[in-house]
């Protein structure tokens, strides 16, 4: 028997063993012996890990989590979900689409308001960048954004879209967000914020795609440019100015549209950062913000190590929210 055939046979035997074990565990859960089944899963997890059977451990924990979710055993399911991540961390598993989809499946089944869900997504994002402290893998952000969009959690969805490379998906989500939750008078503000945030992350392509797609798809925006709404014209001109990189054009543009830019006090904060990134404006002494909002603002404004991340914005990711 060749080495390859031997490995295949070994893999098949392992899979058969996992299936037999899963059958016993499923029977315990179906009988309602949730605690006992949970402890059995954990025991098997540590046994597999001690034998470096990482694939078997991950598969068993993933299927176990799905089983507990199907019986609405949120705590046990969340615990096994965390063990899935632990396997990936300890085995230094590669970031593959199939694995990311599995992680987001677990995320989607967790109670939307549970602290376990927050901990899970934070840890998953960290793993997806090899624990480098960067903002997370763009594909994972995209999948999270799509899941949160389905839940109509638009602000968190936007945060993840911002750190993905899916400007088109972001725009379509914002159209729905604006139409379902926003005032008609604010139709331009939804996209303006997104464009400015993409630019703060030095993602010109994302900014351009979100702007063009949003203005094309939104039922309340007449065909342009030029647009009826001055703020949309400002965004259009800004994207052109960013490509040109001329400070005088940027300065005149901000001056011309000052009345529109007063509608949200954050616009000038964003524009200060954009001026530094694209037009050579020296940085101001930036204020320090706290909390989740502060994390977003500090990353957008380039505080600390986040500044380096902006250079790689289309390869990085992490959750963000700004209303």
Curated annotation (Swiss-Prot):
Q: Which Gene3D superfamilies match?
A: Tetratricopeptide repeat domain
Ordered alphabetically, the record's keywords are: Cytoplasm, Transport
Highest taxon above the source species: Eukaryota
> Where in or outside the cell?
Cytoplasm, Cytosol
Q: Does the keyword Transport apply?
A: yes
Compositional bias annotation for Acidic residues: 304-315
Q: One GO CC term of this entry? A: cytosol
Q: One biological-process term from Gene Ontology?
A: tail-anchored membrane protein insertion into ER membrane
Region of interest called Disordered, as start-end residue ranges on this chain: 303-323
The principal localisation class reads cytoplasm
Any one Pfam family here would be GET4
Keyword Cytoplasm included in the entry's annotation: yes
Whom does it interact with, and what assembly results?
A: Component of the bag6/bat3 complex.
Give the function comment from the record: As part of a cytosolic protein quality control complex, the bag6/bat3 complex, maintains misfolded and hydrophobic patches-containing proteins in a soluble state and participates in their proper delivery to the endoplasmic reticulum or alternatively can promote their sorting to the proteasome where they undergo degradation. The bag6/bat3 complex is involved in the post-translational delivery of tail-anchored/type II transmembrane proteins to the endoplasmic reticulum membrane.
| Similarity comment: family membership | Belongs to the GET4 family.
Which protein, by its recorded name, is this?
Golgi to ER traffic protein 4 homolog
Query: Which species?
Result: Takifugu rubripes (Japanese pufferfish)
């Amino acid at each position: 028997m060749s080495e390859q055939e031997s490995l295949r046979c070994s893999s098949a035997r392992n899979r058969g063993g996992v299936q037999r074990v899963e059958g016993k565990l499923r029977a315990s859960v179906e009988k309602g012996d949730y605690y006992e089944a949970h402890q059995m899963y954990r025991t098997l997890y540590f046994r597999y890990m001690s034998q470096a059977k990482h694939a078997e451990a991950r598969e068993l924990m993933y299927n176990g989590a799905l089983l507990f979710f199907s019986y609405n055993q949120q705590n046990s399911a969340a615990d096994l979900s965390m063990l899935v991540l632990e396997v990936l961390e300890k085995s230094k598993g590669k970031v593959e689409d199939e694995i990311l989809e599995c992680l987001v499946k677990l995320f989607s089944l967790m109670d939307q308001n549970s602290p376990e869900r927050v901990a899970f997504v934070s840890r998953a994002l960290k793993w997806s960048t090899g624990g480098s402290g960067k903002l997370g893998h763009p594909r994972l952000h995209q999948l999270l954004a799509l899941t949160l969009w389905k839940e109509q959690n638009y602000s968190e969805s936007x945060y993840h879209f911002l750190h993905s490379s899916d400007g088109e998906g972001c725009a379509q989500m914002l159209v729905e967000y604006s139409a379902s939750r926003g005032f008609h008078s604010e139709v331009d503000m939804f996209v303006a914020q997104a464009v400015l945030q993409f630019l703060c992350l030095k993602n010109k392509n994302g900014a351009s795609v979100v702007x063009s797609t949003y203005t094309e798809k939104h039922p309340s925006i007449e065909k342009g440019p030029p647009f009826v709404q001055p703020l949309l014209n400002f965004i259009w001109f800004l994207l052109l100015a960013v490509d040109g990189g001329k400070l005088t054009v940027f300065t005149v543009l901000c001056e011309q549209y000052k009345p529109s830019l007063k509608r949200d006090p954050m616009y000038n904060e964003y524009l200060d950062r954009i001026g530094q990134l694209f037009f050579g404006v020296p940085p101001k002494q930036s204020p320090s913000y706290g909390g989740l909002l502060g994390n977003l603002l500090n990353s957008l404004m380039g505080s600390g190590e986040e500044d380096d991340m902006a250079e790689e914005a289309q390869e990085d990711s992490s959750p963000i929210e700004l209303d």
